[in-house]
Structures are given as C-alpha cells and as structure tokens.
Amino acid sequence: MPRRRVAAKREILDDPKYGSQILAKFMNHVMESGKKAVAERIVYGALDTVKSRKNSDPLEIFEKALDAIAPLVEVKSRRVGGATYQVPVEVRPSRRNALAMRWLVDSARKRGEKSMALRLAGELLDASEGKGAAVKKREDVHRMAEANKAFSHYRF
C-alpha cells in the first residue's frame, strides 16, 4: 500500500460547445503535446462530419460509440508459484471509459483518411454501428477473458 495520500480526482470542466464532461475528457485523449486548441478543432470537426453524414445528434452517436467500445472484463497477469496466469477481472466504470477513449483514438490514428477529424468521424460512425478496429479490440479483450475464465478464482 502507498504511504502517501491518494491523489484527489481533478474536476474536468465541460466542453464549451456541447456542455459535455465526457467530451472534454475525450479531447484530452486526442490532445498531443499540450495542444488543446488543435484537439478541440479535430473533435469538433469530427462531430460536425458525423452530424452531416447521419443527420442526428453527434453527441448521442459519440456516447453510443463509447458504449460499443468500452470493455466489461479484461485480463490481468497474476503470478502463482512459477507460472503467470491471465486472470479475468471486471473493469471499473472510470477505467472502462478511459480504455474506450484510448482505443477509439488509437484506431482512428491508424485509419487511412486524409485528416484526423475525418479518421475520427469514420471510427465513431463505425463504432456506433458495432464495427471498426476499436470494437474489434474490445472483442479481442473479451475473448481473452473468456478463454482464461478457468483462472478467475485467482482474485486480486
């Protein structure tokens, strides 16, 4: 156990355009080298593209995409005797969102469209429909947890 006090969670301000705290957190995941204005331009550009393609609320599509990506279980390595087992554990809600955002940004960066805003929009639309690289990542993690269900009695 750590000897110091646990750091307090910082309060994140809502984003100015949509008034959503989860979108503000997502912008922080998109941001590189502290360039928040660039990250905002990318995210708002992606949401505008989503709005023009789907003619519906882009924030709803964003939240639907995050739900489709967020994992329910993951595996953690646990050493027992001389062997290391991959033990399936449930994911806490805050980590679920963080992983979903990270996977969404990573898979958007690997796409082939011209700008990051278009890549992100494409990945958001794919994820909201239950397909795309980020959803595949979630399914891989779930499959790994299912395969190692036999070791679930090694709790943390």
Curated annotation (Swiss-Prot):
GO BP, sorted A to Z: translation
Subunit architecture: Part of the 30S ribosomal subunit. Contacts proteins S9 and S11.
Gene Ontology molecular function terms on file: rRNA binding; structural constituent of ribosome; tRNA binding
Function: One of the primary rRNA binding proteins, it binds directly to 16S rRNA where it nucleates assembly of the head domain of the 30S subunit. Is located at the subunit interface close to the decoding center, probably blocks exit of the E-site tRNA.
InterPro entries linked to this entry: Ribosomal_uS7, Ribosomal_uS7_bac/org-type, Ribosomal_uS7_CS, Ribosomal_uS7_dom, Ribosomal_uS7_dom_sf
Family per similarity comment: Belongs to the universal ribosomal protein uS7 family.
Pfam families: Ribosomal_S7 (PF00177)
Keyword terms of this UniProt record: Ribonucleoprotein, Ribosomal protein, RNA-binding, rRNA-binding, tRNA-binding
Record lineage: Bacteria, Pseudomonadati, Pseudomonadota, Gammaproteobacteria, Pseudomonadales
Annotated GO CC locations: small ribosomal subunit
Domain of life the protein comes from: Bacteria
Name of the protein this chain belongs to: Small ribosomal subunit protein uS7
